[in-house]
């Protein structure tokens, strides 16, 4: 896609189609900068086109340990993934509160919480469609470099790269010190993600270009957990803007296939 807006709308269109075809879909939802445009487009579709989420179940992809929905704090200071999803998406659509699932970031027993989250996904029938980004170090969810590609929901320590990114992108701007920011995260595992029936992976900007190339064209390795996308056997859609796609060696071929696919209404790989 030419730009972030086009990327976001393309992803939202796929999610909307999923929800229309299966109103009780189970969605796995990522947070961060990249998917904000997707959620805003889905909100627009809900308000202007009547897209309903009333029977949808939603599972957030991860949550920072020690963070949780705190409505008392201003949104800029509450950096929990639960608050993000509420402010950017859930409060604007008709999804039922009981169908929204978050990791409990305040848990005193992370292992138990992760097991319960895994079980809740299973009891819901599994994830129908999982929305993902990719970290600058290639992490999927918060499965940092070295995480097992067969991992289930688990607690992970954040790497220096992720901590630096989080500090510069979020915490420094609101006066939170490095010592005060979260250093651990509860996340769906790579194995959990790979069991979703459909995947959408998004990436935007030149800062993601090299890691996108490594994940899609390089070896499958636990050092770049997003490279596990190459193992995925279901329906996967990777949506990149021009900047994020700029280092792919086969970009001309991909663009050619995209044009042919649109012309003949085919899905090419």
List PLM regions with ranges:
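Short beta-strand segments
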Residues: 28-32, 59-61, 103-104, 131-134, ...
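Class I SAM-dependent methyltransferase SAM-binding "motif I" and its flanking Rossmann-like core
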Residues: 141-188
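N-terminal glycine-/serine-/threonine-rich phosphate-binding loop
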Residues: 1-27, 44-47
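Ligand-binding beta-strand-loop-alpha-helix segment within the catalytic cores
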Residues: 52-129, 252, 258-268
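A glycine-rich beta-strand to alpha-helix segment
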Residues: 28-38, 120-145, 269
